[in-house]
């Protein structure tokens, strides 16, 4: 399935990782404008990498394990206006973060983790890898972020709301802490079903108990139209906004 944005195009080449609203929200929300070195963990077909390239002047490194997704990511990067700033690593993030050149190197890390923690897996293996947390659970993901993130860097993620408690439990075992939490409601009259998270490293001069900023983002009003919040967030990407 293919999707065209204002400045780039994404074709998932049937890899099982098409453009999602979650990805667009995360890519538009993450504070990337000043980042010089950006890491996209589990890049899929390259959506977050290309959004990051559009929103910054930084160098983008995308890591994707699944072969078909990596091929789609490479294709989309090559076709984009920022091919010279985008690099794909086809491999496991846990291996990548062991390499000395990437340790404490990135000043921003973005990730839209797999989101089905329980229940039946998808029939096709590549789609299952895209959607199920068996491939990269929260603990190894957070360890990779901690290893690759610079001392003053940040990491941005989006999760289903039901995963937040378990994610926070894993987070408390790391040298990372929660800076911002934005609960995302798909419609004004519904409960939040997603959460945007901004993480940072705990420095020697600060405490893990520093207060986290809590806000909300509503995507659509009761009439089904995008809210002013959503329009302001995504207007640089969606063609019809």
Swiss-Prot record:
Main location: cytoplasm
Function, as annotated: Specifically methylates the adenine in position 37 of tRNA(1)(Val) (anticodon cmo5UAC).
EC number: 2.1.1.223
Listed name of the protein: tRNA1(Val) (adenine(37)-N6)-methyltransferase
Pfam families: MTS
InterPro entries reported for this sequence: DNA_methylase_N6_adenine_CS (IPR002052), SAM-dependent_MTases_sf (IPR029063), Small_mtfrase_dom (IPR007848), tRNA_Adenine-N(6)_MTase (IPR050210), tRNA_adenine-N6_MeTrfase (IPR022882)
An example Gene Ontology biological process: methylation
Family statement drawn from the similarity comment of this UniProt entry: Belongs to the methyltransferase superfamily. tRNA (adenine-N(6)-)-methyltransferase family.
Subcellular location field: Cytoplasm
Annotated catalysed reactions: adenosine(37) in tRNA1(Val) + S-adenosyl-L-methionine = N(6)-methyladenosine(37) in tRNA1(Val) + S-adenosyl-L-homocysteine + H(+)
Domain of life: Bacteria
Enzyme class, spelled out: transferase
PROSITE patterns linked to this entry: N6_MTASE
Keywords annotated in UniProt: Cytoplasm, Methyltransferase, S-adenosyl-L-methionine, Transferase, tRNA processing
Organism ancestry: Bacteria, Pseudomonadati, Pseudomonadota, Gammaproteobacteria, Alteromonadales
Cross-referenced CDD domains: AdoMet_MTases
One GO location term (cellular component): cytoplasm
GO function terms (MF aspect): nucleic acid binding; tRNA (adenine-N6)-methyltransferase activity
């Amino acid at each position: 399935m293919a999707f065209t944005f204002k400045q780039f195009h994404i074709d998932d080449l049937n890899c099982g990782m098409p453009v999602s609203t979650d990805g667009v929200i995360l890519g538009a929300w993450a504070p990337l404008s000043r980042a010089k070195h950006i890491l996209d963990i589990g890049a899929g077909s390259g959506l977050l990498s290309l959004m990051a390239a559009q929103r910054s002047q930084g160098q983008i490194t995308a890591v994707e394990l699944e072969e078909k997704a990596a091929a789609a990511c490479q294709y989309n990067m090559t076709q984009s206006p920022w091919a010279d700033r985008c690099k794909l690593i086809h491999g496991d993030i846990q291996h990548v973060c062991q390499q000395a050149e990437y340790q404490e190197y990135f000043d921003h890390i973005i990730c839209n983790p797999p989101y089905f923690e329980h229940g039946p897996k998808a029939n096709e293996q590549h789609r299952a890898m895209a959607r199920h947390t068996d491939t990269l659970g929260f603990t190894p993901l957070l360890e990779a972020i901690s290893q690759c993130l610079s001392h003053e860097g940040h990491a941005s993620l989006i999760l289903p709301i039901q995963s937040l408690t378990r994610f926070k439990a894993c987070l408390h075992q790391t040298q990372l802490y929660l800076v911002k939490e934005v609960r995302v409601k798909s419609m004004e009259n519904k409960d939040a079903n997603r959460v945007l998270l901004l993480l940072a490293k705990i420095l020697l001069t600060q405490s893990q108990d520093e207060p986290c900023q809590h806000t909300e983002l509503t995507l659509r009003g009761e009439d089904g139209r995008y809210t002013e919040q959503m329009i302001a967030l995504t207007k640089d990407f969606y063609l019809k906004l």
